[in-house]
Amino acid sequence: AANQRLCGSHLVDALYLVCGERGFFYSPKGGIVEQCCHNTCSLYQLENYCN
């Protein structure tokens, strides 16, 4: 999958998709917004935020 910019609700939706029942840890201060919204991130990187 190509890297993509994901912001706000799009980012949360992507986390739900990637993490599924595991759930995820969403903290704007955790670097995910900087990584995925200000820059681009891959689904592989998103998985790092799953529980």
From Swiss-Prot:
Cited function: Insulin decreases blood glucose concentration. It increases cell permeability to monosaccharides, amino acids and fatty acids. It accelerates glycolysis, the pentose phosphate cycle, and glycogen synthesis in liver.
Superkingdom in the source lineage: Eukaryota
Gene Ontology MF terms in the entry: hormone activity
SS bond partners: 7-37, 19-50, 36-41
Record's protein name: Insulin
Subcellular location per the Swiss-Prot or TrEMBL entry: Secreted
Record family assignment: Belongs to the insulin family.
CDD domains cross-referenced by the UniProt entry: IlGF_insulin_like
Claim: Kinase is one of the keywords in the record: no
Taxonomic source organism: Alligator mississippiensis
InterPro entries assigned to the protein according to its UniProt record, in alphabetical order: Insulin, Insulin-like, Insulin-like_sf, Insulin_CS, Insulin_family
Name of the encoding gene: INS
Keywords: Carbohydrate metabolism, Disulfide bond, Glucose metabolism, Hormone, Secreted
Assembly and binders: Heterodimer of a B chain and an A chain linked by two disulfide bonds.
One GO-annotated biological process of the protein: glucose metabolic process
Entry GO CC: extracellular space
